[in-house]
């Protein structure tokens, strides 16, 4: 209804699907603060790659984390809170699912890059950051 009100109803649709069951081809596929909670992030990234249009983009928004755990704890004021929440919520959730990789909310850019490279992406970059989030772009 809101898409119609905004004048975008002719080019917008909504569907309920999980990260490995949606159909179609997309210019942009987004994951907002969610990939680290998923048991099979490599498989999910691979599924996204298979559903991207030519020159399509995956936009990944994840909690801000530095790659080195010790530096993350000293230089990231949110790290202690996010490690605590991740240990209690995110990681157990991921471990309970198929594959159970358990990335957690403080995976960091290098680990996320590795996930997307394993899924067949060849370009991965930090598009932006805030004190709370990394905004990452992956392309084939």
Report residues per predicted region.
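Conserved SAM-binding strand-loop segment of SAM-dependent methyltransferases
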Residues: 7-19
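A short acidic, Gly/Pro-enriched loop at the edge of an enzyme's catalytic core
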Residues: 17-29
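C-terminal alpha-helical "lid/dimerization" subdomain adjacent to the S-adenosyl-L-methionine
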Residues: 61-119
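A short SAM/SAH-binding and catalytic strip from SAM-dependent methyltransferases
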Residues: 27-42
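Helix-to-beta-strand junctions that scaffold the AdoMet/dcAdoMet cofactor pocket
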Residues: 8, 38-39, 52-53
């Amino acid at each position: 209804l809101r898409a119609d009100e905004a004048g975008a109803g002719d080019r917008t649709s909504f569907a309920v699907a999980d990260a490995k069951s949606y159909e179609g081809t997309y210019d942009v596929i987004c994951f907002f603060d969610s990939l680290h909670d998923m048991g099979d992030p490599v498989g999910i990234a691979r599924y996204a790659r298979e559903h991207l249009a030519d020159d399509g983009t995956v936009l990944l928004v994840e909690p801000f984390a530095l790659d080195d755990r010790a530096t993350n704890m000293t230089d990231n004021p949110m790290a202690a809170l996010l490690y605590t929440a991740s240990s209690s919520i995110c990681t157990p959730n991921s471990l309970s699912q198929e594959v159970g990789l358990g990335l957690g909310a403080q995976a960091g850019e290098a680990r996320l890059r590795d996930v997307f490279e394993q899924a067949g992406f060849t370009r991965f970059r930090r598009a932006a950051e805030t004190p709370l989030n990394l905004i990452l772009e992956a392309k084939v």
